[in-house]
Amino acid sequence: MAKIVWDESGKRFYETGVKNGVLYVQDESGNYPKGVAWNGLTAVTESPSGAEATELYADDMKYLEIRSAETFGATIEAYTYPEEFEACDGSAAIANGVNAGQQDRKPFGLCYRTVVGNDVQGNALGYKLHLIYGAVASPSEKAYSTINDSPEAITFSWEVTTTPVNLDGFKPTACITIDSTKVEPGKLAELEKKLFGDTSTEAQLPLPNEIKAMFAEE
């Protein structure tokens, strides 16, 4: 039996950053066929909720505990957003350059990348890809103010709820995370080709079952 050792060199891990955001507007079939870059992404706060305990009693004692379903939400913050996101934010074009608000909000998917680092390699150790499915953005305020001697760009913010999608052998999920330090590089490259596209293929967001099959052990 090995003795526990704390804070070994190379095992002091951390996570930081957010970049390489990609928006995928969901189509009528529930797929995410065309991704576009989300420039100016500054923060994504993942906010799972639910899984609340209900205690059941019998024979004058605690009998068991059951938990409610868990849901996944998030907050997205950015200095700007892709034009394609306007349909996800309740806006519809009635003419070129003219939009009407308070319209139906299209569901969307999102991909973004965060850094995985340690005490030896720093931020170069690796990264995680975060994939979100079935997201719907809630209305949010936009606070415009006069330009002064300390100008600041507006930071847009959206609260997001999700509807999970099927994952064979597991409960439905709205989020998938891929750790570059643990998966096979070739399979990761195959996934990134789908997520980000190349000169011959459009970027698209594969569904969880496709990702499961892609990374299945041979």
Annotated model-derived regions:
Residues 46-48, 56-57, 61-85, 150-165:
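Oligomerization/assembly interface segments of phage tail-like spikes and tubes
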